Amino acid sequence: MASTGLELLGMTLAVLGWLGTLVSCALPLWKVTAFIGNSIVVAQVVWEGLWMSCVVQSTGQMQCKVYDSLLALPQDLQAARALCVVALLLALLGLLVAITGAQCTTCVEDEGAKARIVLTAGVLLLLSGILVLIPVCWTAHAIIQDFYNPLVAEALKRELGASLYLGWAAAALLMLGGGLLCCTCPPSHFERPRGPRLGYSIPSRSGASGLDKRDYV
């Protein structure tokens, strides 16, 4: 029962992490306008995401534009797109595999096979969390580096957007859920079965020596 509860908790955290990753990748809030210097009061705020950029006017009107050309985008943005998509697909696959091998389902009858399936699902979720963490940390590092770079104009400096914080939380949930699924697998299922010990005994020579003695009597 304890392992079943851990499996359900791990899958719940993984689902929340997957949803958080989806929202983080979809929202154009990876980079936002930095309010520094004389730009505390501005007429518009710029939001930048993986798929589009938005401009919010002081009147509340917002205009968004999807990036037209993929090849014209920076390499870090292209890599972030690819990693997020792969992470979403990998996490979804991990969830489906986890449901197949969960203790509360009857898709697989063998307990050893169930344990191996759940372990595979946990590894997939851990990998997906790492794939989410890479573009989020990469983008945050680039934003901070440009923010403190005196050669970058203040109008071009950005701050960390809400999508980055959501991405960190989603990656943590995915890795925590995957770790719980890995912990639910008992090690006894993965030990190689040991056969009976093959021993041998040295035949006693007392009988033979006795016969020899009787022959000489």
Swiss-Prot record:
Extracellular compartment spans: 34-81, 138-159
GO MF term list: identical protein binding; structural molecule activity; virus receptor activity
Disulfide pattern: none
Source taxon at top rank: Eukaryota
Main location: other
Cytoplasmic side: 1-12, 103-116, 181-217
GO terms (BP aspect): calcium-independent cell-cell adhesion via plasma membrane cell-adhesion molecules; cell-cell junction organization; tight junction organization
Family, per entry: Belongs to the claudin family.
Function as written in the Swiss-Prot or TrEMBL entry: Plays a major role in tight junction-specific obliteration of the intercellular space, through calcium-independent cell-adhesion activity.
Stated name of the protein: Claudin-9
Species in which this protein is naturally found: Mus musculus (Mouse)
